[in-house]
Amino acid sequence: MASFSTNEFKSGLKVMLDGNPCAILENEFVKPGKGQAFNRVKLRNLRSGKVLEQTFKSGDSLEAADVMDTEMNYLYNDGEFWHFMHPESFEQIQADKTAMSDSIKWLKENSNALCTITLFNGAPLSVTPPNFVELQITETDPGVRGDTSGGGGKPATLETGAVVRVPLFVQQGEVVRVDTRTGDYQTRVS
């Protein structure tokens, strides 16, 4: 297995630390006036999502993590697992609830949404939904004219169960585009 020396550390690099795959978020090289140089590294554990800070002496090395990101289409949920398919090889993969985390509220069955799946040794670690999804509003209060004292927005429940703030003119049954990274309403589609 390949390994990376401290002089090869950079943001986005995926390494193994204490048996867990981690992604380097920040790397700072420190050369004190007295003593050996070292790297102060901020890492995110890809399994738990926790961010930790470590220091490594100059010249130390870490093993490369067998982590890869792949684009796959979302197919369906069978109650326990969420199923995805590679668009070219038609290979299917299933992700559990921990790998799905917040992605659950943005994915609709048979939508063929192209998701980014992070695989570690062939098993899904995390699922990132597309940046924008188009979902139908199943429940929202009617927007009454002149009811803008609170900033001009109202909560709306989408067909996947997610709740977003939408403008007053958006009605029940309409399809809206939502940014999955922030959970914000973008525009009305129909």
Curated annotation (Swiss-Prot):
The scientific name of the source species is Psychrobacter cryohalolentis (strain ATCC BAA-1226 / DSM 17306 / VKM B-2378 / K5)
Q: Which InterPro entries match?
A: Elong-fact-P_C, NA-bd_OB-fold, Rib_uL2_dom2, Transl_elong_fac_P/YeiP, Transl_elong_KOW-like, Transl_elong_P/YeiP_cen, Transl_elong_P/YeiP_CS, Transl_elongation_fac_P
The similarity annotation says: Belongs to the elongation factor P family.
Q: Name one Pfam family in it.
A: EFP
Is the keyword Cytoplasm assigned to this protein? yes
Record's keyword terms, sorted: Cytoplasm, Elongation factor, Hydroxylation, Protein biosynthesis
Pathway stated in the Swiss-Prot or TrEMBL entry: Protein biosynthesis; polypeptide chain elongation
Localisation: Cytoplasm
- Role noted for this protein: Involved in peptide bond synthesis. Alleviates ribosome stalling that occurs when 3 or more consecutive Pro residues or the sequence PPG is present in a protein, possibly by augmenting the peptidyl transferase activity of the ribosome. Modification of Lys-34 is required for alleviation.
What does the entry give for GO biological process?
Answer: peptide biosynthetic process
Per the record, what is one GO cellular component?
cytoplasm
The superkingdom listed in its UniProt entry is Bacteria
In Swiss-Prot or TrEMBL terms, this protein is called: Elongation factor P
The modified positions for N6-(3,6-diaminohexanoyl)-5-hydroxylysine read: 34
Q: Name one GO molecular function term.
A: translation elongation factor activity
Describe PTMs of this protein. May be beta-lysylated on the epsilon-amino group of Lys-34 by the combined action of EpmA and EpmB, and then hydroxylated on the C5 position of the same residue by EpmC (if this protein is present). Lysylation is critical for the stimulatory effect of EF-P on peptide-bond formation. The lysylation moiety may extend toward the peptidyltransferase center and stabilize the terminal 3-CCA end of the tRNA. Hydroxylation of the C5 position on Lys-34 may allow additional potential stabilizing hydrogen-bond interactions with the P-tRNA.
